[in-house]
Amino acid sequence: MNNTLNQHYEEKVRPCIDLIDSLRSLGVEKDLALPAIAVIGDQSSGKSSVLEALSGVALPRGSGIVTRCPLELKMKRKKEGEEWHGKISYQDHEEEIEDPSDVEKKIREAQDEMAGVGVGISDDLISLEIGSPDVPDLTLIDLPGIARVAVKGQPENIGEQIKRLIRKFIMKQETISLVVVPCNVDIATTEALKMAQEVDPEGERTLGILTKPDLVDKGTEETVVDIVHNEVIHLTKGYMIVKCRGQKEIMERVSLTEATEREKAFFKEHAHLSTLYDEGHATIPKLAEKLTLELVHHIEKSLPRLEEQIEAKLSETHAELERYGTGPPEDSAERLYFLIDKVTAFTQDAINLSTGEEMKSGVRLNVFSTLRKEFGKWKLHLERSGEIFNQRIEGEVDDYEKTYRGRELPGFINYKTFEVMVKDQIKQLEGPAVKKLKEISDAVRKVFLLLAQSSFTGFPNLLKSAKTKIEAIKQVNESTAESMLRTQFKMELIVYTQDSTYSHSLCERKREEDEDQPLTEIRSTIFSTDNHATLQEMMLHLKSYYWISSQRLADQIPMVIRYLVLQEFASQLQREMLQTLQEKDNIEQLLKEDIDIGSKRAALQSKLKRLMKARSYLVEF
């Protein structure tokens, strides 16, 4: 890199790249995408040679798949005279590298450990850090070369495995794809470029690198120039062309420094490609310069979005952690207090739920909306039953009159007929009332179970204990409530109300009847010689009393249900759960945490820690 570039970017380039490297080393990439340059290419495209030329170290070479894991290559430019430094890290392993010649061996060892000895691949990242005066400030991610055909020892779908791994990286909007293509193949047929175009049709984050210009067939040189000039397959970021060490030069032990000089001479002296050198589109040093500028620009462009993503992830992680709670402490005394707090919070929420007050835990459960709806249905049932009763009593009154009328003269009300018909109607309401009780009892049980699940997430034994108590209390209280309802209906079979109440109801019913038919018609009916007047009078009495009885039942049945199935349920649950705290021998068993919940909480705490660290890095930047 030239001095002007170094001076201009000395305070800007390294901090930018270091920031992203630091975020990646924190593991933030598990949570969100980071700006990166991913290097992709078909097998034998010259990808490894380009990376070697940029990094100054030998990387695994050979036939078939040599890059078997994503390799993060972090290059840090040192001042002249400072010593070369290397470090490789993967999974929980970290190792310093003293000699550049050991790099290839260390990468192979890492790949064997992560992807197995042989030709398999792995998604796990190997990080290689190189510090030297001869490297640019740059971080690249090298991905396996695209294999078209599986060779011996490889799975049949190796090609698809590699493509899936490559897509995982290049599909992210934060990734620049560095596509390596040999000059001696038809660029339109290269798999790597096709894949880049699939995820980046406009080529806005794709940079093409042409390799092996010395192997171009005579007469096709101008096609190569046209490609680099962006006239064949357009990429917004354009193309570069480089000439790296070939196999012959490697065998002859040509150093990378000498190879760079030979590359420069090759382009300067080439009849067709010299224009590309003059325009700054050729050689490894120019490529390094462009890549550094592209990466820094890309990082700066991505930072605002990155900050937003980190804030969103932090908020999301905090919310998730709140759901899982803090987990039980280690100290035995503190564990007891933890259990007391947990059980007390649950029982208080149960009481609040039964009284319609807001719950301390913030859980959104509302049993009263269900009760109001169901009690409304019960009242509607009473009204509809009354309407049906009114429609059929005329015929029934006549039948009862014939059956039960004794020595009375016409026009006298038969109280026995009245009583039998009232009791018959009330008996028909008992079954629906008990059914309504069971429906509401089941709905309340479900709400309490939801509250228990929310309160005791991650503590299966504590949850099981609460569920067992809820089921038992439900059975007992439902049975008690049913008994009380049936007693209520037995009492309703005693035909009684205050005289004033009955008189008022009778007057109301008569007034309604008067409004429904003309006065003359009423008079003619009342004073008719047959017993129709008696029937009309009887119907008025029946309607009047049913109205009183149904008003009592409309309130009394819901009150019994609400008291026993909800209010007493919550109180009994509170007593029994608090009683659990007296059983000291069960404390450890009750606080036994679900393994999955514990590990999930630990993962979330780790995620929160790295996101907060990442935020602090961005704030300090």
Swiss-Prot record:
Residues 535-621 form the GED domain. PROSITE patterns: G_DYNAMIN_1, G_DYNAMIN_2, GED. GTP binds at residues 41-48, 142-146, 211-214. Residues 66-68 are annotated as: G2 motif. Residues 243-246 are annotated as: G5 motif. It holds the Pfam family Dynamin_N. This is Interferon-induced GTP-binding protein Mx1. The lineage of its organism: Eukaryota, Metazoa, Chordata, Craniata, Vertebrata.
